Amino acid sequence: MSTAMNFGTKSFQPRPPDKGSFPLDHLGECKSFKEKFMKCLHNNNFENALCRKESKEYLECRMERKLMLQEPLEKLGFGDLTSGKSEAKK
């Protein structure tokens, strides 16, 4: 009877994220960039549009230290801040 209860159930199959992993910054390599970004958000009533420069710098730090995949900054929404070239090469 116990096999009849489990007959129709499906097991959960986890799947990886679409863009790969996003490792935590355990060593604090980008901590100063993160704190600068968070301070900007706090000072600007959490209006993230006012802190795009800080956000860009934080993501650049993460990409340089292999804490996230390299992506062109234009693809991340910073095309207007890149002066015609992306520092993050594919």
Curated annotation (Swiss-Prot):
Biased composition annotated in UniProt, kind: Polar residues: 1-12
Motif, Cx9C motif 2: chain positions: 51-61
Main localization category: cytoplasm
Protein localization: Cytoplasm, Cytosol; Mitochondrion intermembrane space; Mitochondrion
Family annotation (InterPro entries): CHCH, COX19, Cys_alpha_HP_mot_SF
GO CC annotations on file: cytosol; mitochondrial intermembrane space; mitochondrion
Record-level GO BP terms: intracellular copper ion homeostasis; mitochondrial cytochrome c oxidase assembly
Disulfide linkage: 30-61, 40-51
Pfam families: CHCH (PF06747)
UniProt keyword Heme present: no
Keywords associated with the record: Acetylation, Cytoplasm, Disulfide bond, Mitochondrion
Protein's job: Required for the transduction of an SCO1-dependent redox signal from the mitochondrion to ATP7A to regulate cellular copper homeostasis. May be required for the assembly of mitochondrial cytochrome c oxidase.
Name of the protein in question: Cytochrome c oxidase assembly protein COX19
Gene assigned in the entry: COX19
